[in-house]
Amino acid sequence: MLRDLPRRVIIIGKSAIVATDAFLLFPDAVDAIVELPKTDQGTGDLYSLLLPQLADGARTPEIPSIEEVVARNPDLVLMKDFTYTGLGDKLTAMGIPVFTISLEMPEDWNAELRQLGKLVGDPGRAEEVTALYQERQDKVEQAVSDVPEQDRPKVLMMRVSSTDGPLTYTVAPDTWMQTRFVEDAGGIPVWLGSGFKNKGFAKISFEQIAAWNPDYIYIYSYKDPAEDFLTQLKKDKRWADIPAMKAGRVKAIPGDFSNYAQPISRWILCLQWMSADLYPQLFPDFDMEREICSFYEDFHGLSDPQAQREIIDRYRRSVQAN
């Protein structure tokens, strides 16, 4: 623990958007941020709405040098745990406090937000936020818990990407949040137990997808709009024979400035949307746009009508191909 509350905070390393999202759940600590890291994954920057006073300024390099960190005179450095070796350990050796986070699973958010709350002197806010997450999770769990195993749909949740060539399909390891999304939403992840190690996304082929024959296929992307890839799949003659495509059950997971299918603060919206899509009869009053607006107001204090309209407009574009 720090002797004093942090006054100069910087966030560094790959996936810095995860740590930034978490820190911004504590509004009374936001003024301590010296400058923002890179938070635009390729589809826009939410922080132009959340922190306009910092969003247009200089950004901390993703992998700064020791000298660049020291020049910013931080009394706290936040980073993802997998980026600690090689930079965080050197900063620690120099006496600069470093707080690493995982936030790869729902339970990580509860535990680590409590740690972060103590660090910034606002444990009450940590309890408030974890309770808000739990409330939304409980609604999903209570709705789908009685669905028998044999009645649960087979689901493929895959990341789609392209670099000036054919589309690439990948799935997350069994132990990552994407797998939990499907399980907690009441589905059966078709890739579970396929031998993919916890070392990152694993590439899969079209033939493997066809062999799995999932009832639902949900696609997502971080650097590009997932809906653009969905449009491409719908035009692909090979995909026309996939039963899920014939049934209209190949869909893009929504987002706004970022896709919801990742461990950012908005991960809960992915879980809510997926469960309502799998079981519309269990969520007859579900309104995704209402859930998005209440999320931003409750979790990030964003109630400005114009800002919320921009977020909803982005959400609508993300699902327009569904």
Residue ranges with predicted function:
Residues 6-11, 32, 97, 152-157, ...:
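Residues that mark the start of a beta-strand
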Residues 12-72, 76-82, 190:
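A short, structured surface patch at a secondary-structure boundary
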Residues 216-278:
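Active-site/pore-lining binding-face segments in mid-to-C-terminal subdomains
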Residues 87-167, 201, 252-321:
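Extracytoplasmic substrate-binding proteins
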Residues 177-178, 190-208, 213-227, 231, ...:
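Pocket-lining segment of extracytoplasmic ligand-binding domains
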Residues 29, 94-95, 185-186, 246:
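Short, structured coil segments at secondary-structure junctions
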Residues 37, 175-198, 221, 247-254:
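His/Asp/Glu-enriched short active-site or ligand-binding loop at hydrolase and phosphoryl-transfer sites
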